[in-house]
Every structure is written in C-alpha cells, then in structure tokens.
C-alpha cells in the first residue's frame, strides 16, 4: 500500500444555508460564545431535550459515515451531515461557532481534531473522523467516530479499534459517586498497553444548553481532579489517541490540529448522562 502524503488545506465551498425557521444558538454571527459557567447537573426537561438532540446527532454521524470511501471529499461528508441535521429541524452546532465555517468537523489521519471539511479527497487507506453536534430545543448533542476508507493498514485499523474500545471502557466507568478522574485513568492505562499516547490539551466537556458548560473531562490520569459524578450531569467523553508523540501544530485556519510527527490519530465520542445507577449514552440511534 503506498504511503499517504501529509495533508494540506483544501478549498472551502460556500457556507451551507440553514432554514430561517430553525433556531440558532446565541453565538451564531458573534466572535465568541456565552458559555462556561452553566450548571453541570441538568433538569429532567433539559435531559429529555438532550435525548432528542443526541439521537439527531447520531443519525447525522451515521449517514455521513456511510459515505466514507476513497474518492469522496470531506466537503461531501459535510453536506450529508448538514442536510440530515436541518431535515430533522436541528442546527449544526459547529456552524458559526467562534467562526468555524462548516457543519461538522472532518479529521483525517494525522489530524487530531477540528479539521474543516473542504475539497480534500479521501484516499484508500485513510481513517476519517467525523464530529457532529446538533442543536435543537435549546440544547446540544455531540458525537464523533472514526471510519476506515478502503483497505486500511493494520497499524491504523488497530488504532481505530482500540480507541473505540478505550472510549467504551471509559463510558462504562461512569456512575454517580465515582470520581470523574477515573475516566482518564481507564483510557490512559488501556492506551499505554499498546504504546499509544493520549492527547492532553483537547478534552471532553460538559454540555447542555451550551456547547461547553465549563466542566472539563480529562482523558488521561490526573488524580488531582476532585470532581465527583452526580446524577443529572451531562458531558462528553471523546479521547484522541496518537500512534506517536503528543506534540502538535495548528494550521493557519486556526482550527485544524495535526500531530507534529505526522503519525496518525483516532477519536470517538459520545454525549453521556449520569443516571441514578450508572450511565445513559444520549448519542445513540
């Protein structure tokens, strides 16, 4: 299999329209978002709305994921996700968030996160992360997954499989009364078995009526975190796991984060609810 050349920015298509009847988050058209100090524990009413947002986000991710194949552009994946969201009455949360120009993130190969969909053509052997967030009913639902394109090298296929497994192991630790830090401990201990490195500077987050409510969910072991999980908390778990070192660079677009050594990376994400007895995944179909 020929080696993939390092990625570079493609050409952006025009901004996709959203029907006027679909409610926008407050930050659309503004340089910043009003967020970061909202309650971490949600009301039953907000939780029920988040179930709706989560299902729509999951549906958009599944539809876009089906299209991942050699020869497809990342802009086409954005079109599919965008149309699914608006057809279901949801606003694409990333569109206009701090100036982000597209309706989802598409992060290939060495892109850790926040890749912008453009004219980049997916090549046989690529791995493609799609990150979709739906805003409907005044709340957000956020999810992502990494999809293989064509014949993926064993090293990269295993990275994807193990990142998915690390994510699910972490989700299964969620329980009221348990320290939030156990999430990162489980992810990092599993990833370290294979010599992988867990990204530190980009984290999971609290989510609800705002995209990021101030709660930070680390994906690495940090016992100093004293937060205890409580029923009604909603947050994402979304580990990014690298084959190589943790050093990264950000492209001139201000968003796209790539590994400095250009080794590949994978990610999965769900929005979660801490229940009275454990966890509910809100971003499931």
From Swiss-Prot:
Activity regulation details: Inhibited by bengamide derivatives and by various metalloform-selective inhibitors.
Binding-site positions, a divalent metal cation 1: 131, 142, 269
Amino-acid positions noted as binding substrate in the UniProt annotation, renumbered to this chain: 114, 212
Subunit structure comment from the entry: Monomer.
Keyword field: Aminopeptidase, Hydrolase, Metal-binding, Protease
Gene that this sequence comes from: map
One function term, GO molecular function aspect: iron ion binding
Cofactor note: Binds 2 divalent metal cations per subunit. Has a high-affinity and a low affinity metal-binding site. The true nature of the physiological cofactor is under debate. The enzyme is active with cobalt, zinc, manganese or divalent iron ions. Most likely, methionine aminopeptidases function as mononuclear Fe(2+)-metalloproteases under physiological conditions, and the catalytically relevant metal-binding site has been assigned to the histidine-containing high-affinity site.
Name of this chain's protein: Methionine aminopeptidase 2
Residue ranges of the TM segments: none
EC number(s) stated in the UniProt entry for this protein: 3.4.11.18
Residue numbers binding a divalent metal cation 2: 142, 205, 238, 269
GO process annotations (BP): protein processing
Similarity comment: family membership: Belongs to the peptidase M24A family. Methionine aminopeptidase type 1 subfamily.
Catalytic activity: Release of N-terminal amino acids, preferentially methionine, from peptides and arylamides
Temperature remarks: Optimum temperature is 37 degrees Celsius. It lost all its activities at 55 degrees Celsius.
Cofactor(s) annotated in UniProt: Co(2+); Zn(2+); Mn(2+); Fe(2+)
Role description: Removes the N-terminal methionine from nascent proteins. The N-terminal methionine is often cleaved when the second residue in the primary sequence is small and uncharged (Met-Ala-, Cys, Gly, Pro, Ser, Thr, or Val). Requires deformylation of the N(alpha)-formylated initiator methionine before it can be hydrolyzed.
InterPro entries recorded: Creatinase/aminopeptidase-like (IPR036005), Pept_M24 (IPR000994), Pept_M24_MAP (IPR001714), Pept_M24A_MAP1 (IPR002467)
An annotated GO cellular component: cytosol
């Amino acid at each position: 299999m020929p080696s993939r050349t390092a990625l570079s920015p493609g050409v952006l298509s025009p901004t996709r329209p959203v029907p006027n009847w679909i409610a926008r988050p407050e930050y659309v058209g503004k340089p910043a978002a009003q967020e970061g100090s909202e309650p971490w524990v949600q009301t039953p009413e907000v939780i029920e709305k988040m179930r709706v947002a989560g299902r729509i986000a999951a549906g958009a991710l599944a539809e876009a994921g089906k299209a991942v194949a050699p020869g497809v552009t990342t802009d086409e994946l954005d079109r599919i996700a965008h149309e699914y969201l608006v057809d279901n009455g949801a606003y694409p949360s990333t569109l206009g968030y701090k100036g982000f120009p597209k309706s989802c993130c598409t992060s290939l190969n060495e892109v850790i996160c926040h890749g912008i969909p453009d004219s980049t053509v997916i090549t046989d052997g690529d791995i493609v992360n799609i990150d979709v967030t739906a805003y409907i009913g005044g709340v957000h639902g956020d999810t992502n997954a990494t999809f293989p394109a064509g014949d993926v090298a064993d090293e990269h296929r295993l990275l994807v499989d193990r990142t998915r497994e690390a994510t699910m192991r972490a989700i299964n630790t969620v329980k009221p009364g348990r320290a939030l830090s156990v999430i990162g401990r489980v992810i990092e201990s599993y990833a370290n078995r294979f010599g992988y490195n867990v990204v530190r500077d980009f984290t999971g987050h609290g989510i609800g009526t705002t995209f990021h409510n101030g709660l930070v969910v680390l994906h690495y072991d940090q016992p100093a975190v004293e937060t205890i999980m409580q029923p009604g908390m909603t947050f994402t778990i979304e580990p990014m796991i690298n084959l190589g070192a943790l050093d990264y660079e950000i492209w001139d677009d201000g968003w796209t984060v790539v590994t400095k050594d250009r080794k590949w990376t994978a990610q999965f994400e769900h929005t979660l609810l801490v229940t009275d007895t454990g966890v509910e995944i809100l971003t499931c179909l």
